From Swiss-Prot:
Taxonomic placement: Bacteria, Bacillati, Bacillota, Bacilli, Bacillales
SUPFAM superfamilies: CinA-like, Molybdenum cofactor biosynthesis proteins
Gene: cinA
Classification via InterPro entries: CinA (IPR050101), CinA-like_C (IPR036653), CinA_C (IPR008136), CinA_KH (IPR041424), Competence-induced_CinA (IPR008135), MoaB/Mog-like_dom_sf (IPR036425), MoaB/Mog_dom (IPR001453)
Family: Belongs to the CinA family.
Protein name from the UniProt record: Putative competence-damage inducible protein
CDD domains membership: cinA (cd00885)
Amino acid sequence: MNAEIIAVGTELLLGQIANTNAQFLSEKLASIGINVYYHTVVGDNNKRLQQAIEVAEERADMLIFTGGLGPTKDDLTKETIASSLEEKLVYDENALALISNYFKRTGREFTENNKKQALVLNGGTVFANDHGMAPGMGLNKNGKVYILLPGPPKEMKPMYVSYVEPFLRNFTTGENIYSRVLRFFGIGESQLEVKVQDLIDGQTNPTIAPLANDGEVTLRLTAKHQNVHEAEKLIQHVEDLILERVGEFFYGYDQEFLHYKAIELLKKKGLTLACAESLTGGLFGNQVTENAGVSSVFKGGVICYHNDVKQHVLHVPEEVLSTDGAVSKECARYLAENVRELLKADIGISFTGVAGPDASEHKEPGTVFVGLAIKDEPTVVFPLNLSGSRQQIRERSAKYGFYHLYKKLEEI
């Protein structure tokens, strides 16, 4: 079954709010085997909404609407759909009682426009709104399924989970969709694709979808099957083939981001970390502290943006700063080693470089050095040549820091 999501609201077209409902619904629908091929956004206008309905009916089996169920004049979703389907709107007694009781409790006047929220499509299934006023509804007519949901995510999401998904399962084959995301770093999207292109071209179940994002690449493996264990077998087989070829760049699954994986490995090894940040200006330390319980492994950091701090706090020799420069392999080495000693940590990591937009010390933007000093191990400095905006270079430098930290920890 194919679905189209139609988000109703002029505020969406104006960019005043993001259409997060479509993302949520697409993911949920995919998990129960309903394909979403189109997202449509239309303003609070009867004529344009009617046009959107007519177009969607030509290309989808299921039309899912969000928004436009409220009490105001521009909330016209159910009125437009009722007119299109030649169905009556009737009051749902449970919803009407809920709304009436709310106004009684709050001592406010129960006006006719608020009463409007209890109107539902005649003959449809009503979805209770446990977090708001306007109920949702579902109707199967003329070979199409129509689903109407409230716009506020705090109302729509729990309504979908509790009432809508069980209703939708009546229209599915029972074949569910299962996905697993493989995360890679240190290899470009085009390079990775070349290595697994035959697998991408030859697979239909599971499918393989690459995506590049901020210096890393993901592969989403998606399988369809009625049985979750069989779907996992399909995915595992393809995953094994992929990792045979590019396993050296693999670091995690799904939402296991680099900073999470690195910190979890630090905890597992029982090692502590300190950072010296010039180029990144605290970005690395900020991401470290996004992990719960990180105080057990993170000693702290020094933002050594000015050369005075590099020299007098982290004891980078003046001759290194004057000869090699602050953006150099030698400076990165001193920063990593000395912040480790200063904060009495097992590992010190440092970042120095040129974020741009202008060159510095006759070095081009994107010139970066990441130093890694591990107790009882030789210090390693990783030179990087990054591209992008000033912010992208800083963010990617921090990611490379987590990546090299993670890889070194795997070796210990």
